Every structure is written in C-alpha cells, then in structure tokens.
Amino acid sequence: MNLNRRDFSRLSAMAAMATALPRVDAQNDENAAGRKLRWGIVGLGRISMDHFMPAVAASKTGKLTALVSGHREKAEKQAAMYNVPSPSIYSYETYDEIAQNKEIDGVYIALPNSMHAEYTIRAAKAGKHVLCEKPMATSVADSKAMIDM
C-alpha cells in the first residue's frame, strides 16, 4: 500500500483511537477487562473501508459487529470479510434499529459531512457511544445539538 503523509496521519490517528477507547472503558468497568469494544460502522466509503475497519480488525481491543450502508451488496461483501452477521447489516432507513442490537457498543460515523449531525444524534438516542469523523458538523447549531445529546 502506498500512503501519502495525509493518509498515514489519518490511519495512525484512527488506529490509536481504535485501540485506546476500550482501555478507558475497561478502567471504569471491572467486568470489561478483556472485553473488546464492539463497533458499528456507519458509511462504507474509503475512510472506513481502507483505514478504520482494517485497524479495528487488527486491534486486540476492538471488533466490528455491525455495518450501515445504502448499498446492501457492498455491506454484505464487507460483512463476509469481517465476520459481521447478516442481521447486523442496516440500511440508512433501518438505522434506528441499532438501539436493539446489544452487540454494538459504539458507532463510527464516516458519512458525508452534512450527515454527521443527524446520524450522531440518532446513535446517541439509541444509547450508543459515537466516534464521528471530522469535521464534527457543518454548522455551529448542529455541533451544539450533537454536544447537547
């Protein structure tokens, strides 16, 4: 793989986040020791497929457990690669059903910038932790709404 400096920096930051978050959880929960953080990936574009998903799969502290995509076939292909069960593949229309999926601890939002606020807020309402790509939102109002969740 031929990486430029920008891609290397992004991949390094995401890998660090993917491995650090479960340690924070484990420090606060005696029952979490040795448990992997279970990720739902929202958006199957280049950033998530080329960087975040491989980093989580390679980590000792993370596991991919759900996918959200507007393209079912693409999601099924990725699910097969990462052993994500078919019932844990969601469309944008069925996204709110993640609330019932106890195999998702948090979601990684890798959607177009204009969609960050909506899907972050919906995940928070579903009781899921959120890691959102940058920029957080496209307006101050959206950012505030995300923070206030």
What are these regions (language model features)?
Residues 88-147:
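Beta-loop-alpha module in the N-terminal Rossmann-like domain of NAD(P)-dependent dehydrogenases
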Residues 7, 35, 70, 74, ...:
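An amphipathic alpha-helix/helix-turn recognition signal
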Residues 55-59, 78-81, 122-126, 145-149:
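Alpha-helical structural signal in soluble globular domains
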Residues 1-2, 68, 88-91:
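A structural signal for short, well-ordered beta-strand elements
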